[in-house]
Structure formats: structure tokens, C-alpha cells
Amino acid sequence: MAEETKGHIGHSKSDQRRGLAGAMPRKLNVTMMGAGSGFTNSVLKDVVLIPDSVGGELRLIDIDAERLELSRKLMVKVLEAVGEGDKWVIRASTDRRELLPGTDYIINSIEVSGLACVRFDNDIPLKYGISQNIGDTIGPGGLMKAMRTVPVWLQILRDAEELCPNAVVLNYTNPMNIMMLAAMRVSKMHMVGLCHSVQGTSHMLAGYTDVPYEQVQWNCAGINHLAWFTEFNGPDGNSLYPTLFEQATDRTSKFATEEPVRSDMMLHFGAFITESSGHLSEYLPYYRKRKDLLDKYTDTGYRGEESFYANNWPTWRKNQDDYRTKLFTGEEEIKPERSWEYGAWIIESIEKNQPFLIHGNVANDGCISNLPQDGCVEVACLVNANGIQPTRFGRLPKVMAAICDSNMRMFDLAADAAIEKSKHLARLALTQDPLTAAVCSPAEIFALVDELFEAEAEFLPGFK
């Protein structure tokens, strides 16, 4: 791989929160799907803070009129707080077809069914012995979130193809791999799936090795939430893995106790993985299938706590809403700072034609030669005026590719199930899920999926 795709040309720039060189050449129409979410005001603040912007329209779309109105009012406050109110016009609607025409960039953060299915996705699988920590991208919870979300996502893309076919689509909604895989099979829109796990993990590893982030160099590739840091080197080009292996071998070290699953996977398979230990454990057949393994390899919170997401998401949602209200009333400060989320940096890079490196979820098509070519992978992508261009990684080490591939088989069937609205394909998809298959028989998996479909029928129209 070319040197410019190693490390963090883009990551370093976003970490420093500075903009790219050059002026924005035109006014932009940026449309936020699922604008009632707490993510909206952060990612759109990033957009309006692009240096030398000439503004445009921020278009907010959500089917929840109450949450949409809060986002609209808060975005007005954001523009005032950062001194950009004279450049941007805010429009809001519950009808996406009203605001999609003329859109240049679509940022997707929809959440279908809100909190209504969180307990179903967790508690019904638990009856069958399947323990989940997060349960929204893989396993029974991830499957059902895909079945609820993908059909709506595809409707959005069909409208976009009709009303703004040249728009660039930036997807943040999970389950990322299934969302992007279904989209790539149905839509011709130029799109990428975005996650912050590569940025976050690379920063974390730099901290554990006591090397300034701007001095480390690394290579990372795989699938979303299961991408491997195949290289992690210091400024002299020497591997920093010996330092990490030394810490991981001492199971009482901070590194091992904070990352029980990720450090164990590194010790056995040779490289560190991008997602938190608890969430990663859901992608694997090793750590959650017996109580003794759960006791040994998981801990509280994101380190693997059973039902962590289901037990806490309603509270997190309320806290997020309370925080947004405080931002609006002035009880909390709106800071004129950009985040390290990729969205606005991609827009800036394309518009200014300044190269920027991201890690994105894209069609494989040769990027990783020993993973399914019609699958979705997470690799380094170069961004400039030509759009988002995936780079070729080559071959993953065989065992790393095999672990990714075991999940991609589930994603493949799940994407087809969501596109075709097929309950049977959904059943088959879950038989290929590594954790579920380690716990349940095929008959039990079929019964589990049927029970989930019955419980969530309100949000699954048209499935047969």
C-alpha cells in the first residue's frame, strides 16, 4: 500500500480540528436524515465550522415533529453561537421529498422504532441463551435492527436517486455493514458508511504505547467493528506491538483489564481490533457462550456487561435530550469546536479538492483480496474532488480474513432478507451468526427469529 494511505493524514488533521487549505467554492445544501437525533447538532456544527465556508442550506428531516423542532431551534442557537448565522438557512420538514431536491450531501442517522424494540432485541434472545452487550449491529439484535431499518433506508435512497441523484450520501446508521451492503445492491448513489472506531482505537493504542499520536503509523482493514490493525509502528518504523503484547500478557495490567477481549484476541490472532471488548465479543463464538467465559472475559459497561445497551439506552436517550435542552436554554455552552467525525471533513475535502484520508465502509471490489468481493469492507479511502475512493489493502492474514468472513456470511443473507422482506432469509442469516450458532441449534434459531418477528411486527410491514 502506498505510504500516504498508512497512518492518519486525515486522522491527524481531524484530531487537530483545523480545516483544510483553500476556500469553499459554492453554497451547499446539506440534508440530515433522522435530524431529531442528538447527533444532528454536533455533525452539522462541524459543517458550518468549515473554514472559508460560503454557507447554504441545512435541511433537517425527521418523522418525529417534536424532536425535529427541538433540533431546528437548537441549530439556530448553534449558528448564533459560532457566528455563522448570516451564511446558513435552516429548513425543516417531516416530508423528505420536500427537501431532497437540490441536495448536495445527505447525512443519514435514522433510527427506526426508537426505543420500542430495544427490550425485545435483548430479552427474547436471552431466553435462548444468547447474551448481548450492545446488540445492534450483529447477532439477533443486529439482525432485527436491520430488518426494521434497511427497508426505510432503501426508500430514502430511491427518493434521492429521483430527486438529487448527484448527492454524496454519508451513512452513520447501524447496523453499518448490512445497511451498506443492501444499499450497494439496490442503489447507484455515491455513498460511504462512517464509524469512529478506527479513529478512537488508533488514539487509544497510541496512548498505551506512550507515543504521540502524530508520530505513529498504522495500517487497518477488515469489516466495520472488526477491522485489524495489521501494523502499528512508531516514528522510527519499528513495530509498537511488542509493547502492547507485553501489557496484554500481564492480565492484571490496565490494558488487559480495560480491554479483556481485544487484548486476548490480539494475543491469540496477532493484531488489535477496532471495536470495544464488549461489542467485539458479540461478533465472535468464543467469549459469550458460557457463564464461566462471561465471568472470565467480560466486565461492566462496554467491557461486555450483559444487556448493557438495553438496560441503559432509555436513560442515555433522556440524558441526551436533557443536554440538548440545556444547550438551547444556555445552561450548557455551545463550543465553536469541530469534532473528529469524518462527515464535515469529507464535505470540505470534496469541495476544496484537498486530499483527506478516512476509513470508510465501501464495496470490497478488490480492496481486500481474500474477502468476498461482493461484500462490504472497512478500508482506507482517499477523498478529494473525485469523491470517496477506496484504496487497495491486499490480503489480510488468513485467520483474520476467516474471522471477518464468518460475519460477512451473516451480513450477506441479512441484506437479502431486508431487501426481499423475507422472514425465511432472516432465519437463515441468523444461523450464520458466529455467536448465535455457538449457542443454539438451527431449530432454536428459527424459533427465536419467529418470536422476534411476532413481537416487532408493527415495525416490520411487508415481511413474509
What are these regions (language model features)?
Residues A116-R185:
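Rossmann-fold NAD(P)-binding glycine/threonine-rich loop
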Residues N29-T31:
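Conserved beta-strand elements of the Class I
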Residues G36:
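Conserved glycine-rich cofactor-binding loop
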Residues L49-E84:
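Glycine-rich phosphate-binding loop and adjoining beta1-alpha1-beta2 segment
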Residues V89-G102:
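Short acidic low-complexity segments
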Residues P101, I107-N108, N171:
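Redox-cofactor binding/interface segments in oxidoreductases and associated redox assembly factors
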Residues Q155-P235:
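Internal, well-ordered domain-core segments that constitute the primary functional module
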Residues D210-K464:
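Long, compositionally biased stretches enriched for glycine and/or charged residues
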